[in-house]
């Protein structure tokens, strides 16, 4: 059974035996590990199991308790690797394991494949009494992380901020760090509860309805509150503007990319193949290059290291600030949105409204997993004939045009092929989507 997916191990009712085996496999090549966990009810169970495997294999283990992923990623610099027990935005019955290198980057597919081979081939009975690792606890991780982040943000304005932590790991950091940064903070869903009683951890418009209503109520008297909302492990964030609008992920990313280039003079930024062409349009004005990479924080971090770009972000709200660290950080990202507002001297709603609006369409077509590659091969060849141009095949199949683009990509976690279209006019968007759906369905039927 394949364990690692697009973001570590993540599954419903994660078996502690799997966690034990992962820990034991890690101990083959690493001798000093740090472990953090989010608020899920199975967190202690999975932490204990993976710790047992590590100790049995002779790896020393330090636990730092309930923390967001950015805290774990920052802490990893003092160890051989970091282990985060989280299922991110998934419902409470899920849990997972995500591994981080010493530099804060998540394990890449080659590293995960190496672990999978060890797990598949090992008997897990090699531990002996004279080669057991040492276990310890560090209660200072949150303090160290918070101090480091606050040293590297510069906010002089006393912003009004509603922080929504989803009863998840962000609770132990975000309300305090925004307060220490000088903000007037109202915290929502800010007590830790692995059942996510306030809202589900995916920070989307549906789940954030109550938080939006709170902000609208506060701002009815001209208070100008904005919202910062996290997912289950706070490696992501989304903002809610003063009008109570959950900001479009693409628009917020485009606005922030422009800010980074204007403030720092950066000549390039990194984003993914599914990000809006508004980024290209914005940065072209400043002569900055947009480097696109595969979807996922691993690919973004790798490209940041390779190119020396200062910032990389995905339209999912996963942003990496290389000048601070290489772990996706929704807490730092929220603070830097405030820096952006201060830099421009504008409300967030006005900054967002300046970003070009395009027509976006998304569809998903059911496709058996064993046909996905054949379907993508068909789309690549057929699309070349239809559009009379070479496709981009970095991640899925993408066709770019002057007026828009289309990305067709197989889901890494579900039996679907997804079609994403963005265009400057509605007719062109609909035409692209029709072609995309037709190619996917034909590719399935002919294979």
UniProtKB/Swiss-Prot annotation:
Catalysed reaction, written as an equation: alpha-D-glucosamine 1-phosphate = D-glucosamine 6-phosphate
GO biological processes: carbohydrate metabolic process
Residues given in the record as Mg(2+) binding sites: 88, 231, 233, 235
Keywords, sorted A to Z: Isomerase, Magnesium, Metal-binding, Phosphoprotein
Cofactor(s) this protein cannot do without: Mg(2+)
Pfam families with a match to the protein in the record: PGM_PMM_I (PF02878), PGM_PMM_II (PF02879), PGM_PMM_III (PF02880), PGM_PMM_IV (PF00408)
Post-translational modification: Activated by phosphorylation.
Cofactor comment text: Binds 1 Mg(2+) ion per subunit.
Entry's EC annotation: 5.4.2.10
UniProt keyword Glycoprotein present: no
PROSITE patterns cross-referenced by the UniProt entry: PGM_PMM
InterPro entries, per database record: A-D-PHexomutase_a/b/a-I, A-D-PHexomutase_a/b/a-I/II/III, A-D-PHexomutase_a/b/a-II, A-D-PHexomutase_a/b/a-III, A-D-PHexomutase_C, A-D-PHexomutase_C_sf, A-D-PHexomutase_CS, Alpha-D-phosphohexomutase_SF
Protein family membership: Belongs to the phosphohexose mutase family.
Protein name: Phosphoglucosamine mutase
Lineage: Archaea, Methanobacteriati, Methanobacteriota, Methanomada group, Methanococci
């Amino acid at each position: 059974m394949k364990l690692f997916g697009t973001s570590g191990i993540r599954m419903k009712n994660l078996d502690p035996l799997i966690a034990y085996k992962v820990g034991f496999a890690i101990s083959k090549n690493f001798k000093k590990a740090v472990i953090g966990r989010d608020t899920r009810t199975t967190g202690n169970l999975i932490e204990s199991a993976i710790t047992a495997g590590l100790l049995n294999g002779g790896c020393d283990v330090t636990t730092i308790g309930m923390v967001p992923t950015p805290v774990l990623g920052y802490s990893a610099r003092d160890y051989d690797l970091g282990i985060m027990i989280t299922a991110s935005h998934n419902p409470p019955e899920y849990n997972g394991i995500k591994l981080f290198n010493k530099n804060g980057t998540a394990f890449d597919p080659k590293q995960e494949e190496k672990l999978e081979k060890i797990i598949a081939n090992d008997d897990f009975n090699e531990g002996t009494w004279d080669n057991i690792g040492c276990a310890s606890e560090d209660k200072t991780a949150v303090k160290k992380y918070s101090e480091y982040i606050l040293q590297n943000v510069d906010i002089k304005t006393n912003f009004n901020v509603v922080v929504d932590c989803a009863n998840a790991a962000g609770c132990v950091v975000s309300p305090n760090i925004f307060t220490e940064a000088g903000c007037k903070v109202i915290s929502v869903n800010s007590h830790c509860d692995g059942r996510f009683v306030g809202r589900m951890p995916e920070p989307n418009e549906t789940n954030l309805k109550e938080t939006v209503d709170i902000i609208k109520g506060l701002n009815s008297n001209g208070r100008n509150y904005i919202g910062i909302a996290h997912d289950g492990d706070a490696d992501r964030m989304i903002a809610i503007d003063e009008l109570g609008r959950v900001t479009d992920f693409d628009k917020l990313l485009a606005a922030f990319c422009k800010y980074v280039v204007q403030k720092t003079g950066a000549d390039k930024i990194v984003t993914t193949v599914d990000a809006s062409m508004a980024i290209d349009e914005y940065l072209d004005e400043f002569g900055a290059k947009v480097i696109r990479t595969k979807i996922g924080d691993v690919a973004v971090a790798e490209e940041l290291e390779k190119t020396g770009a200062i910032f990389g972000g995905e339209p999912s709200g996963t942003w990496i600030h290389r000048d601070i660290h290489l772990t996706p950080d929704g807490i730092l990202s929220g603070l830097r949105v405030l820096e952006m507002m201060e830099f421009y001297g504008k409300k967030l709603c006005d900054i967002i409204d300046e970003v070009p609006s395009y027509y976006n369409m998304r569809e998903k077509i059911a496709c058996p997993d064993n046909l996905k590659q054949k379907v993508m091969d068909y789309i690549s060849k057929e699309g070349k004939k239809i559009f009379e141009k070479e496709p981009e095949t970095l991640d899925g199949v993408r066709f770019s045009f002057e007026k828009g683009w289309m990305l067709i990509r197989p889901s890494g976690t579900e039996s679907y092929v997804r079609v994403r279209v963005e265009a400057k006019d509605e007719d062109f968007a609909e035409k692209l989507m029709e072609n995309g759906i037709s190619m996917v369905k034909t590719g399935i039927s002919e294979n």
